[in-house]
Amino acid sequence: PWNGPIGGVWLGYVDGEYVINPTVAQREKSEMLVTVAGTKQKIVMIEAAANEVKEDVMLEGLKFAHKTIIELCDFIEGIKAEIGKEKFTYEAHTVNQELWDDIKAIAYEKIQYALDTDDKNIRDERMGVVTDELIEKLEEKYPTIQEEIGEILYKTQKEIVRAWLYQGRRVDGRGLNEIRPLSAEVDLLPRVHGCGLFTRGQTQVLTVATLAPLAEMQRLDGIDQEESKRYMHHYNFPSYSVGETKPSRGPGRREIGHGALAERSLVPVLPSEEEFPYAIRTVSEVLSSNGSTSQGSVCGSTLALMAAGVPIKRPVAGISCGLITTDEGFTTMVDIQGLEDFYGEMDFKVAGTKIGITSIQVDIKNDGLPYEVIEEALRKTRDARCYIIDEVLLKAIPEVRDHLS
């Protein structure tokens, strides 16, 4: 029982023309390579690498790809009509409504107060106090409250945060288009080729750049041929960045995915091997996390590369956009923090220069995005990344160093 079907295609842009599922030769000449998935009505996933592509080119490309997605969905529905089976009936889990009503009566305003801060540690402490108080007051009436209270508090917090966001209010007091306090520094570590520290609210990322001979490029054994990668970006998310003490077991899917996103964000602005005959490795260490660490890694990588003397064409910055929808309409907000990502419906991450987009990654929790949401997200993230480049990155290091460290 699901809301499919879903179709997916690759989208290229070669010589000013959109290409569906480009060949290997076409991909080498393409200005962008986008993986797009969607239903017949909406887009559900976007993963893009682009060569400073304009927002309107990206948007029209998604619309072009959607035509083929609709054809694929029709094809799948034809198969379903011919051989498909009847869907299983599914009874959704429901919470204890009586307990939920009692929790709201006792603690709704206290939960609102707990959420109303820009410090996630204070928020967690306040919610811990509320939880203990509720268990103490209601445990006799509801013996199973310890098993049920987590889900009910989650639903209550989600209800409050979403209502606030739709009204234009954020838990940290920002406006919907306002970015958290920003800072950037270079040269914190004296014995590396280049490093940059980028801070956005309670999210902080330290990126270190290292240069080596081209012989040290990463070798990749592909299915059909051996390839090499000259620029490598590795993303580390240690447990201490979120106040935990878990041991490190090596990179997981999250670290691999965020590292790949930050890596392809910088590739379009790197100099050619002839201009700069070095292998380049950047490593981003997340020191503190409250949302958008992957985009913080993009900004940190720009700082580190410029400090190392790598002659990148232009600075690259990244920012995310969130979404809340109701029966009345939708609201988007830039630079979502962890709570807004958790309770919202979209994490629309876009990186690029002031000229155009270099990468996109979109995660959603609803049934898909209409084009008016995508268009607004592209516009808002463009304005935000231009602000970050001008007001933060270029003030920390106005231009690429003219010498290597």
How does the language model describe each region?
Residues 3, 87-225, 404-405:
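Extended amphipathic alpha-helical scaffolds
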Residues 1, 253-260, 264, 292, ...:
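Glycine-rich and small/hydrophobic secondary-structure elements
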Residues 40, 47, 188, 193-278, ...:
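Glycine-rich, flexible beta-strand/loop modules in the N-terminal catalytic cores of phosphate-handling
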Residues 246-252, 284-292:
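A short glycine/serine-rich beta->alpha loop
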Residues 2-117, 305-402:
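Mobile "lid/hinge" segments at catalytic clefts and subdomain interfaces of large enzymes
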Residues 188, 213, 238-243, 263-276, ...:
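Conserved helix-loop functional segments at active or binding sites
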Residues 64, 68, 72-75, 79, ...:
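Generic, well-ordered alpha-helical scaffold segments in large soluble proteins
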